Amino acid sequence: MPPPHVRAWYSYAFAAEVFSSYPSGNIPANHFGTCDGKALQSSDPRGMDRYSFVQSSSMYVKSIAVACQAICIISIGPLADIAYWRKRLLLTFAYSGSLSGILFLLFPPLPYAWTPIMAAILNIVGNATYSTSIVCSNAFLPGLAKEDVDVQKAWEEATSEGLQDGLRDVHEDTDEENTGSVSREDEATHLLPDRLIPAVCAISTQDLALSDPLAKLIEPSNAKKHYESRLSLTTSRLSSTGTAIGFFSGVSVLTLLLIPVTALGGSTFSMRLAIGLSGVWWALFTVPTCIGLPGGAPGHGSDFSASQVKKAWVKIGKMVAPKQIHQLPNLYIFLLAWIFLSDGFHTTTYAAILYASSVLSMSAPKIILVGILVQLAAVVSSVLVPRVQRRLSTTSSKPVTNYKVLLAGVVAAAFIPVYTCAGLVLPFGGLRSEGEMYVLAVWFGLVFGPFLSYSRAVYAELIPPGHESTFFSLFAFTDKSASFIGPAAVGLISDLTGNIRYGFLFLLVMLVVPIPVLGRVAVERGRREAVEWAERSRKEMSDERV
């Protein structure tokens, strides 16, 4: 049985992932164009114009929601790093988000002029509060890892060797500024709170990076390294377990929600009911989190100041300075490709749900089934692909690197918009049936899972040693903030053409253009650049101290 604090932390993953799993992005569109969940009849010319707007409206809402969540994530970063604010922010965002879902239950049975606007606002609030609450939740992770019995034992062994001074900044969970070996210049470049970084790194990322056949695994040589290794492994274990619990909760409840949605014929009310129940679930299972997670007492840093938010935004500029880009070209080339790919992958999920609803006229239960297939396929591929990679690497003269797996995954993902766009010129195929949608959902899931894992793995290989927190902060920021352009562009294309299928041409560009950019990344050279950058930074720090 996990310790009480860990159980409380797991409870939040169990609570929140249900809300994020339900494909609620089509609710605002349904309120624009339907009274009972059915699409507008295409025989009405005025209805066709309105139907085109229905298609694009949810994409605009999704774009605004992603932009808002990026702003919130950056702004609350400094506060989430303070124990006093961390739990308070988590509960505030959690119950604000759950309330945004529950309020869908209060909508009238027939749409009024204000219902689409209110649905869009609730959608934006739900997305933004969910993402920011996850930031606050992940900020607890390092402290929970340090409470582990094995980590405590490793700490005692390290201190017995007289290494406590060198480990003090690593082990102590305090909100005061460290005065140890971490440079203030390096700290100034963090985009997200330090306690969030291990959570970003831990979900199979470091394991994948170290499992690369071309990467060297360095075993701990003393008690200090043993402690740091044990802390990292414990963080990874807790994070992976939390992710698994969240996935189990999301898929299970999503499957259960098929019952009322199917029983009610996939009407707008059934979808509002599903979202409302997701909000109730989120609020209910946040109660153990509220009771069990530790809360900080008022003290140093507990006073809120607008300068804290300003400081968080100043950090962004320092991360993309020309000097940084020049010294680490391969890392920033990869980030450039990642921005396009992340936007393309996430927009594909939004566009596919809208396409299934508006073009294929798939009912709400069938759309939920599509979401379940994507998640199940993603988990299966995330487990199987690393095993296949290792087996191929051991049986082949040339190792299958993380970079090769990632590149293959991106090429495979481009098949989806290619196949959909084929429907513009071919009289058959091209995603014209529900069966094709199910097949593409499985295909996308098989590609999407490894894409996320191996993107982080390749990026981990390009990061300067000892500066993981700084550069994973940038990676996390681009992951959360890059996906607002795609939905807006697809929505605009749908408005201008009256056919959302043309939006997949844009998605094709978003997925194909980064391929040659990604092909320019030289991982081996990038590793050397990262080591040289770290050594140069260490030397500059030493000179400043002298």
Swiss-Prot record:
Pfam family, one: ATG22
GO BP annotations listed: amino acid transmembrane export from vacuole; autophagy
Residue ranges of the TM segments: 64-84, 102-122, 124-144, 244-264, 273-293, 333-353, 365-385, 405-425, 435-455, 473-493, 503-523
An example Gene Ontology CC term for this record: vacuolar membrane
Family annotation (InterPro entries): Atg22 (IPR044738), Atg22-like (IPR024671), ATG22/LtaA_families (IPR050495), MFS_trans_sf (IPR036259)
Keyword annotations: Amino-acid transport, Autophagy, Membrane, Transmembrane, Transmembrane helix, Transport, Vacuole
Stretches the record annotates as Disordered: 160-185
Subcellular compartments: Vacuole membrane
Membrane topology note: Multi-pass membrane protein
Gene3D superfamilies attached to this UniProt entry: MFS general substrate transporter like domains
Annotated family: Belongs to the ATG22 family.
Biological role stated in the UniProt entry: Vacuolar effluxer which mediate the efflux of amino acids resulting from autophagic degradation. The release of autophagic amino acids allows the maintenance of protein synthesis and viability during nitrogen starvation.
Protein name, per record: Autophagy-related protein 22
Organism (species): Cryptococcus neoformans var. neoformans serotype D (strain B-3501A) (Filobasidiella neoformans)
Lineage: Eukaryota, Fungi, Dikarya, Basidiomycota, Agaricomycotina
Gene: ATG22
